[in-house]
């Protein structure tokens, strides 16, 4: 028979357990409550400073180390092991706008005149800072170290409709161009947030591919024909890789994400998207356009969801953009731009504020701020 003392002690323990369970249920409800209309996408729960730093270090590590084999993989903090995941088709509707590559600011005369008058320009379509290393790049990591005042973002399809784009330069010719002397290649590492779902994939381009007569039908088998090249001869061709599904992320949570791209000549191209405590990666052969042979500039930003569209932020939004490179050097890279720079045809409604800073480090980087 239990003594009254032991019985009382057990009763107190039971009360404590019940109280902790009630508290846990309350906390869980708060963390996983149904999102509001303006925050329909993933929102990370708050963590303390030490845990936040640990998670940030994990995101940096995962962004720099993709899976060793082709395919789609995911990982969850704190594990650094990639687990095989299903690959899906990239969004069929997605196609980045083909920017002009010959005129000042992509052939937009109105844009050029406004620049000459000293007017601020919205980011994208030729108005942005890009990073350039002393030689070829083997990888870059894009992030947003500081995000303030952002409560909403709207794209052509609704709230949280945008892309994170990490783009290579598009003035290089590789063996993929065959004997077409005007042909150049371009590659985009993309995270697409499409209102309620997300995808991570790579889009490849061939510009001015084919014969000197714009007869059409010259794209390689399996590629999509984007029409006659507006600046040269031949056709513009594009194709998407497979994709890995990821959550849509609320624009207010951009400080928790990173997008990276890495290439190995004769090996694999890899893109990694990290979101809070989860990472998603896709790996394909570099031989698609052989971008490793010509990649020397990188553009990273948040812009519209393809087709030359815009990502529109609420008034009072400020975002700091960081683009860190791997180029075999610890020297400070070069800030290129903002005029006549960048490679995407998409935009946002923010303007560049202040200058671009370039910093040498184990992973050299540039950093700049945009706001409205």
Q: Where on the chain are the PLM-derived regions?
A:
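Bacterial N-terminal signal peptides
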Residues: 15-26
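N-terminal secretory signal peptides that target proteins for export/translocation
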Residues: 1-10
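Alpha-helical context
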Residues: 13-16, 118
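Exposed, interaction-prone regions of secreted/extracellular proteins
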Residues: 34-372
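Sec/Tat signal peptide C-region and signal peptidase I cleavage site
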Residues: 29-33
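Intrinsic structural disorder/low-complexity segments
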Residues: 5, 17, 190-191
């Amino acid at each position: 028979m239990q003594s009254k003392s032991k019985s009382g002690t057990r009763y107190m323990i039971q009360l404590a357990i019940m109280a902790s369970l009630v508290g846990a249920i309350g906390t869980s409800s708060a963390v996983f409550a149904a999102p509001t209309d303006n925050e329909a996408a993933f929102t990370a729960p708050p963590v303390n400073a030490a845990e936040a730093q640990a998670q940030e270090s994990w995101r940096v590590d995962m962004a720099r180390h993709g899976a060793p084999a082709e395919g789609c993989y995911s990982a969850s903090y704190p594990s650094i092991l990639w687990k095989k995941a299903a690959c899906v088709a990239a969004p069929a509707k997605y196609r980045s706008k083909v920017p002009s590559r010959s005129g000042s600011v992509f052939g937009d005369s109105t844009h050029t005149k406004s620049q000459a008058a000293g007017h601020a320009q919205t980011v994208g379509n030729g108005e942005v800072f890009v990073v350039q290393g002393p030689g070829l790049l083997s990888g870059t990591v894009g992030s947003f170290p500081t995000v303030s005042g952002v409560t909403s973002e709207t794209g052509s399809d609704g709230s949280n409709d945008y892309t994170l784009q990490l783009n290579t330069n598009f003035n290089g010719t590789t063996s993929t161009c065959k004997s077409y002397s005007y042909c150049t290649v371009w590659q985009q590492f993309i995270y697409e947030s499409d209102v309620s779902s997300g995808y991570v994939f790579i889009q490849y381009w061939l510009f001015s591919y084919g014969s000197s007569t714009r007869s059409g039908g010259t794209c390689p088998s399996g590629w999509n024909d984007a029409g006659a090249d507006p600046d040269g001869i031949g056709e513009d061709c594009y194709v998407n890789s497979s994709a890995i599904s990821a959550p849509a992320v609320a624009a207010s949570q951009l400080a928790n994400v990173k997008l990276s791209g890495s290439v190995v000549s004769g090996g694999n191209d890899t893109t990694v998207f990290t979101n809070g405590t989860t990472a998603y990666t896709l790996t394909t052969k570099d031989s698609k356009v052989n971008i490793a042979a010509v990649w020397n500039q990188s553009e990273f930003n948040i812009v519209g969801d393809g087709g030359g569209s815009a990502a529109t932020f609420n008034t009072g939004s400020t975002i700091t953009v960081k683009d860190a490179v791997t180029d075999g050097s610890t020297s400070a890279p070069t800030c290129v731009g903002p005029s006549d720079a960048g490679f995407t045809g998409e935009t946002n409604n923010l303007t560049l504020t202040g200058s671009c800073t370039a910093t040498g480090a184990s992973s050299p980087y540039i950093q700049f701020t945009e706001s409205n």
